[in-house]
Amino acid sequence: AEQLVTSPVGSEDLRYANLAILGRLVDSIIEEQVPRALELAPDLVSIVGGGNDCMRPGTDIDAIAAKFEEAVVALREAGIAVLMGNGYDTRRATPLIKQLRPRVAIYNSHLWSIAQRHDCTMLDMWGLRDLYGPEMWAPDRIHLSPAGHELVADQALAALERAPLPSAGVHMPDRPNRPIRTAVAEEAHWVREHL
């Protein structure tokens, strides 16, 4: 919010309300956060959701996207500009999280279509290659670290300014090679702590 005030798309009159709660599912976002955002009647709402839904086995990705679109429609019909964020690429994530890649990719395809249909700005986290270094992630390897949040905030501002992604191409940082025994032990510890 501080960066937005001094940016070409911001103003001194900017007021900021963070309604986000980590771990929410799309249903909860629609039922709790979107109505509150509508009450505030802002000029802009940023909405990122669905990642936790994608992690749940059996979730109908198409249905989640349809619900997300309902929220976007409600915001746009109220005259609110919408900044949407898509899911990150799990290609270099832990072996368990890596398995979500097809689900996240399908969900992201829906999000891009929603953004186009309703004239929304897209924060492309999938394409933000600088996001994939280990320092960008919290110990749970699901949520961003402070450095990751800063990078995403910078990119959100760039998206609002219609600037290109800061790095292009498909290269992602390599994961360090670890002995299989070490990798299995680390993954088992991660599962116990974070799943």
Role assignments for model-derived ranges:
Residues 52-62, 95-99:
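Surface-exposed cleft-lining segments at the edges of enzyme active sites
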Residues 63-77, 102, 106-113:
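Alpha-helical scaffolding segments of alpha/beta enzyme cores, especially the outer helices
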Residues 20-24, 49-54:
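Cell-envelope and extracellular/periplasmic
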Residues 113, 117, 140-195:
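Conserved catalytic region of serine esterases and O-acyltransferases that act on ester linkages
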Residues 77-82, 120:
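A short helix->loop->beta-strand "cap" motif at the edges of active sites that frequently abuts
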